[in-house]
Each structure stands twice: as structure tokens, then as C-alpha cells.
Amino acid sequence: MASLKMLICVCVAILIPSTLSQDSHGIAGIIDPRDTASMDVGKISFSEAIGSGAPKEPQIRNRIFACSSPTGASVARLAQPRHCHRHADSTNMTEGIAVVFKQNIAPYVFNVTLYYKHITTVTTWALFSRPQITNEYVTRVPIDYHEIVRIDRSGECSSKATYHKNFMFFEAYDNDEAEKKLPLVPSLLRSTVSKAFHTTNFTKRHQTLGYRTSTSVDCVVEYLQARSVYPYDYFGMATGDTVEISPFYTKNTTGPRRHSVYRDYRFLEIANYQVRDLETGQIRPPKKRNFLTDEQFTIGWDAMEEKESVCTLSKWIEVPEAVRVSYKNSYHFSLKDMTMTFSSGKQPFNISRLHLAECVPTIATEAIDGIFARKYSSTHVRSGDIEYYLGSGGFLIAFQKLMSHGLAEMYLEEAQRQNHLPRGRERRQAAGRRTASLQSGPQGDRITTHSSATFAMLQFAYDKIQAHVNELIGNLLEAWCELQNRQLIVWHEMKKLNPNSLMTSLFGQPVSARLLGDIVAVSKCIEIPIENIRMQDSMRMPGDPTMCYTRPVLIFRYSSSPESQFSANSTENHNLDILGQLGEHNEILQGRNLIEPCMINHRRYFLLGENYLLYEDYTFVRQVNASEIEEVSIFINLNATILEDLDFVPVEVYTREELRDTGTLNYDDVVRYQNIYNKRFRDIDTVIRGDRGDAIFRAIADFFGNTLGEVGKALGTVVMTAAAAVISTVSGIASFLSNPFAALGIGIAVVVSIILGLLAFKYVMNLKSNPVQVLFPGAVPPAGTPPRPSRRYYKDEEEVEEDSDEDDRILATRVLKGLELLHKDEQKARRQKARFSAFAKNMRNLFRRKPRTKEDDYPLLEYPSWAEESEDE
């Protein structure tokens, strides 16, 4: 083996070289193309050009191998071209119009009328003060059918209530009075789902003294909305009451009867029944009417057909551009506008299996006809009837296939050419397999829809990615196969020309190869360090000017490293220089056997690294950048496109309003009704109204009227008038005393009266003790006062003393005037008294029918002459 390794060929693979040192013999490194790409170095030596292009940053390791000559111990052969399978889109797509249905979770809403009488029995206690409620009993009783007919015709209701409790019949009268007809008046407080009408505002009564038990009967008629959910076995109202009977219950039916927990006598069906609208007074058209008598109320509603009123499915979306993609075991309905894809079985679904789904064909046909008329009537024709498929998640898809006019004409011509028309494909009904979205019942199947359509959006995204990736992989496989076949042909030819390069490329490492007929002998190569290689810049043979080398020449030596693959028998030759030439693809050839006669105008390019070396006249000239030489590519372009952007659109199957209305009872309506019920009365002050014992006197008046006839009625009226006056006075006093401000005012008045009484008492006592001083203050000096000195006047320097009797005269004059005033006051008082006495006497005579005498004309009081004279003065 060592002897075989001595016969070696040297292959040098230089990718991105490292810097090489050079000596006087022309040892050089590899030129970095970044430094010499745009520079013409001119006519310089090969070693100088190589040395000036030393790279700064080696990228690919330089590896040089010495290969032994293959002997045939290891042989290889090339495979034959394969047949390439062309990947085609095997999916079958059909365009059309789709209408998607979902489960109808909304309750069935209808109008009902509630009839009942609200009975309130109140026991109160009062003792000339505010009344106190000691007991209260409230109940609701139903109204019988005959009175309901009167209510719906005339709008009046009786104040009497007859009801059955504890196996006994009871009667109640409003205000404890005789039965009478009262009009139904609207309640001012109402909501969008309820309207109420009633007959009275008074619910509690009392009297001023003692206990009183009274009864009020309020006839109530309410217009309400009722709700019922599938399977429609009961319904609820805004009042919070639930009725355990189906809204579609009827006695006259040939099929199974609907749910009801009531006896038959409680349910009535009336044909051609007319109802009066209590708000507008209009009579509605006659309809079949149902009445149900409950323990607390009677309820009425219009009879309805179940199949015409409700549907278990509702239309969700309309898709004008839908694509049905056929896979091996399923259909995928792609809704691009909605970014969703629904998968289903390949067999159509029979909608006759569904319970209460008669509305689906009608709605689907109307929607598809409208879309086709707006968008496709001039460009497409319909292909077959509407088909229904049960999609994943509980969605029913109504699909109408479409075909363009050109394609339809082509099919028609082909059918006529074959002398027959295409038969419509028989519709295969869906198998009886069970799905998670289909529930069976005694009356039929029912579709249940998932509350989220996220899975459909993910399915759409997956189908888009799957289609794109499958197309990409198919193109890759086809291109790869064709490329391999083309390369095989080239390699079969290359093995004849240069088996070393071919086998090195195939094995992925430098090898030596030799053609042995139709097979190739291969042997490994030994790596030589790049520091042991020296190149020369002249291609002329020394000693013979007519002969030249066909490729650049070089000198190399083996490595002395212990890791070297060189044989131990040749270690003594590691310092020997071995002559060689630069081969193709940066390979080193052993020996210098490639020669030719020197030619004139010689010009050659040899690959070295990433660039080419230009030789003219067998002498190195310059390095040429590879980009300056036009490249002929044999690369096959791969037909692949990048995924397009896809924005997901949030899809909400059920809106917030739909989810809120899923229950039988609406919490908002119940709360609003309770609040309205508590505040139904128009005047809150009339809730408690005092009776004041009128019932007792009314009974006395009725007794006189019934026993004494007309005289008794007159006497009863007098008694009632007097009693009313007395009761009003007593009630006024009691009300005044019960007022806290009245007590405060009375206290203040008492204090002021006491103060005024004390002042008057003091004045009278002073008047009795000293009348002159009280009446004429200052006229008499008080006791102990010294006499006032006489005043003197000086006139003409003479002193004149005033007479002291002048003061006495003034005092006497004042006293006389005071007496005169007192006399006048006394006369005035006597006259007024006399006039009042005369008036009283005349009134007595008038009542006694006594004739007037002459004495009556005389004055009642004689005045003395001195008084008349004084009065004249």
C-alpha cells in the first residue's frame, strides 16, 4: 500500500485561501478578489500579483490532497435517469352560492293577556291619631270566562270577586259596597313589554276610632309578552309567572298532544273570538283564542300553528362566492370573504329529518334567488338543485352549484355529440351516522350549533397553508427530479473526460478516479499543507523555447506532521520537492506532463480561487474578476411563491343580545315589572284614605230610607248632614291636635295670654287704687314731692309774681274734660247695647209672629237733658 501511495496525483481544492509567504523562487499566496476586482495590475510578475492580493479575512479553508493512482480495488457506477412524476392539483373545485344556517337559540315571543282581580284585605287600628295596619292579606284570583267576554267587549269590570279557596267559595266586594261595573283605566307606569289596566286606586282603608277591616277589589288586565324555548313545553311572562302548558297546545289534534299539566276544564278554545284593545278601543279581527284558568289568573292568547310560527334553525350568513373543494372523504366549503372553511361529508343531508325546520328551504331559496339575480344572471347558469350539507360545528350549508355560460355550452355540445343529454346525478341521502351536532328526538332530529366559529377560521387558514405548501412541495419534487436526470447525463459524459473531478464532486471529498470501461476505479487522497506549495509565473519549458506547459506549474512537498496520512515508509521524502501543475477546479496534478508547442498570441484564463488568472504569451498578466466574465447558468428556477397576507376577521355567531334573550325569563323585564307593580297607583297619597266612620252613619241612613220611605230618606239625609258636620269638626280638631306645629302654636298662645292677663290685672289694680293718676298721669304730683317754687318774670326792671291759682284752674279744666270723655264713652256703649237688645227683641217677635206695637218705636234708653246739651256742644 505504501508503494501505491508513492504514485500519487496531487489535487488542490482552494476555496478562500489564507496568506502564503513567498520566497525567491516565486512562492505566493492567493489573491483576494475584493482588492483586485477593479484594478488592472499590468505586466508584473505572477508572484508579485499573488502577493499583493493577500486576503484580510479568510472565509474558506484551503485544502490540498495527494492521491494515489486507482488500481480497481474500489469501483463505482452511475445510476440511470428516473421517471419524474409531475405533481398536479388533484382537488376538484366547484363554485357556487352558499347560505349557512345555525341553531336558533332565540325564544319564541308572543303576546298574551292576563286577567285577574287583586284582592286586598286590611285591618287597621286608630285612636284619634294616625292609623296603624295590624294585618294585611293580599291575593290574586282569576276572572271567569263570562266576565272576560264582558271586559273584551265593553271595557268594564265588576267590583265583585268570586273565588274558590280551600274547597270553599268566597266573595269579595270593593270598598265593602254593592257590586257595580267599573271602567278599566290605563296605568300611567308601563314598559315596552307590558301594559296594565285597572279599576281602582284604593287598597287600604281605616276609621278614626277603633279597629276596621276593609276590602278592596282591583280588576286588572295586562298586555304582556311571553317567551317559550325549545321544545316549547311551557312559557314565562314578564311578571315572573310561568305557565306549564305549551303555547301550541290544542285539544283538536290528530297527532300527539302537546305538554300540559292542567285539567281539560281549565283550558278553552274559542273560535272567531274578538278582542277589544283597551288602549285604543278598537275591535280586533276575529281569531281563534285560547284561555287558561290558573289558580291566580286567567291568561288568553291567540292559537298558533307550531310549524308556521317557530323554526329550529335561523339564517346566519349569505356567501355570494363560495367554493366547494372535493377531497378524498369530505367536502370543504371555503368562504373567502369570511375567512372560514366548513368541512362536511360528501353525501347531501336530508333536511326532512329535522324537527321544525320547514322554514329552511324557503329562506334558502329566497336568499339564493336574490343573489343569483343580482350577480350571476348574465354570466352563469344554475347546475342542479340546492343541496344541503351538515358542516362541522353544527352548521347547515345550503349550496347552489353554478356554471359559466361557456362551460355549460361546451357540456351541452358534448352531450349532443354523444346523442344523449346528461342525466341529473341522483341525490344520495345522508347516511344514518351520528354526529356530535345532530341530536335525535321522538319528533325528529335537531341540529345543535357550537357557540364559536374559531375552528372554521382555523380550518380556512389550514386549507390555505396546505394548498400552498402542497403546490410548493410538488414543484420542488418535479424540479429536483428533472435536475437530477439532467445532471446524470452530464456526469456520464464527464466521467469520460475527467473522472477525478466527477467522483470528487459525488463523494464530497478529493479522490482519484480512473475509467475502467463502463465503471470508475476510485482511490482516496492525502491532504497536503498549503505552506508546502510553491507556484511559478512562467509556463515555458526551460531548455526548449518551442515547447510550453498547457497549465501553470508548481512545486509541492508532503507534510512532516504526525497526523499526516502519508505512509511511514515515505517519511524520509517529506523534504523532497515534487513537481506538479495546477489542474481544473483548483486541483494540483502530479508531474508536468501537460505540454504543447508554444503558440503565437497565446491567451488563457485559469481558475484560481474565486477569480481567474490571465496568461498572455505563457506569462501571467493580471487577475480578472469573475463578474467581468458572462456566466452561462444551468440552474433550474424553482416555481415557488411566498404566502400572501391573510387577516382573520372576528366572527361572532351569536350576538350579545341573542345570548341575553336565550332564557325563558328576561331578568330586566321581571325587575321592571315588579317595580312598576309597586308603583302602579297614579296618586301615592290615596293609597291610605281615612273612612272616619262614614259607614256607620250610611247604614243608619239606609235603615231610615228602607223603613220609613220618602220621609225616612229625608230624615236620613238630615242625619247624614249633621253627622258629616260633627265628624268634620272632630276630624279637623283631631287632625289639628295631631300636628306638631299646632301644639307649638297653642303653647306660644297660652304664654302670650298669661302675660297679657298679668298686665291687665296690674292695670285694673292701679286704676282702683289711684284712678286720677292712672287716667291723668302727671296731673297730681306724687306723695312726698316738695312744692314747686313760684316763677318770677321781670319786665321793665320790675319783678312781677305770678298768681298760684292759675295752676289750679288748668287742673280743673283737665279733670272736666276727662269726665266729659268718660260720659261720652258710656253713652256710646249704652246705645250699642240698646240697639242690640232692640234687634234681639224684633227677632223674637218675628219668630213668635207677634205684631209690632207703638211702644217698640220709642227709644229703649232715655238720655238726660244735660247729656244731650253736652253732646250738642
Swiss-Prot record:
Motif (Internalization motif): 858-861
Task of the protein: Envelope glycoprotein that forms spikes at the surface of virion envelope. Essential for the initial attachment to heparan sulfate moieties of the host cell surface proteoglycans. Involved in fusion of viral and cellular membranes leading to virus entry into the host cell. Following initial binding to its host receptors, membrane fusion is mediated by the fusion machinery composed at least of gB and the heterodimer gH/gL. May be involved in the fusion between the virion envelope and the outer nuclear membrane during virion egress.
Modification after translation, per record: A proteolytic cleavage by host furin generates two subunits that remain linked by disulfide bonds.
Gene Ontology terms describing biological process: symbiont entry into host cell; virion attachment to host cell
Compartments, record wording: Virion membrane; Host cell membrane; Host endosome membrane; Host Golgi apparatus membrane
Topology Virion surface: residue spans: 22-740
Biased composition regions of type Acidic residues, renumbered to the chain: 796-807
Residue stretches spanning the membrane: 741-761
Region listing for Involved in fusion and/or binding to host membrane, in residue ranges: 124-130, 206-213
Family from the record: Belongs to the herpesviridae glycoprotein B family.
Topological domains annotated Intravirion: 762-873
Positions glycosylated per UniProt: 92, 111, 201, 252, 350, 569, 625, 639
Name of protein: Envelope glycoprotein B
Gene3D superfamilies cross-referenced by the UniProt entry: 1.20.5.1890, 2.30.29.100, 2.30.30.1230, 6.10.250.3280
Region (Disordered): 418-447, 781-807
Hydrophobic membrane proximal region: annotated segments: 684-738, 715-734
Protein source organism: Infectious laryngotracheitis virus (strain 632)
Disulphide-bridged cysteine pairs: 67-525, 84-481, 157-219, 311-359, 548-598
Protein's membrane topology: Single-pass type I membrane protein
Signal peptide span: 1-21
Subunit details: Homotrimer; disulfide-linked. Binds to heparan sulfate proteoglycans. Interacts with gH/gL heterodimer.
